[in-house]
Every structure is written in structure tokens, then in C-alpha cells.
Amino acid sequence: MIETGKIINGDCIEVMKTLPDGSVDLIVTSPPYNVGINYDTHIDTLDMDVYWDWTKEWLTQAYQLLKDDGRVSINIPYETNVQNRGGRVFFVSEFYQVMKQVGFKFFGIVDLEEDSPHRSKTTAWGSWMSPSSPYIYNPKECVILAYKKHHIKKVKG
């Protein structure tokens, strides 16, 4: 049994392997987006195929941890730009395809919008004063809501 309210810090895949299957009601997470953020222990510039394999691995572990009426809430961007690793990615679509492969069932999506996007000063000019290659920054993110087998909770409260 997992201690209520306990925060566990560590590599998500390794930690999830130590927890009992079918013991979790809800997982809330915001995984790395693979856009080059300088994390202490995670490489955020993986080849996209490697990134999706890693995503499938941790989602599989999460799926096993959930109770049959368990749910998952995952904060991700709608799209990303991984310039030298394949260009623009419709991230939410790719991510959801992996979730379906693992077995998750879609419940909904929550649209998020940054009040003051940290990159809002990025222009869409591309080359100086030329529309040849505009840069588009989408400040919106979303939360994908999904469940394991049963949307309705067996135990209320």
C-alpha cells in the first residue's frame, strides 16, 4: 500500500517499478517535452523515436499502477518545434497515439493558455523582414484526461 500524501522523488520509471500494480487512483504529471530544457538528470534533446519509446515505457508503467477505474492527467503542449530533430511536431496527437497503444481510454482535454507566455516576444518574421520562413510560437498547452478501464469510480468519496 502507498502512504497517502507521500511525495516520491526519483526516476519515474524506476520508482513506478517499485510500487504495487493496481494501487493508484490518479496520476498527474507534466513530462519533459523534449525541447531542449536543461534538466539536472534528464536529456531533453532525444531523437524523437527514442523520446516516443521512452514515453511509451513510462506510460506503460503508469497504466499498470492505476486501478481499473484509475485516471491520468497529463499536461503537454499542443505542438513543439524540434528543429534539427524533425521540425514541428503536433505533440498532443503523437502523445495520444502512444497513450492508445498502451491501453488508455480518452476522457477529455482541458485547454490551457499562459497569461504571459515567456516567449511571447518571439516574432513570426523568420528571416529579417521576409516571410520565407516564419517562426510560429503557440503558447497554448493542454491537459489530456484519460482512464484505464472504467471511467466511473467504483468507490465514491
Language-model-detected regions and their locations in the chain:
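Core catalytic lobe of class I
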Residues: 1-157
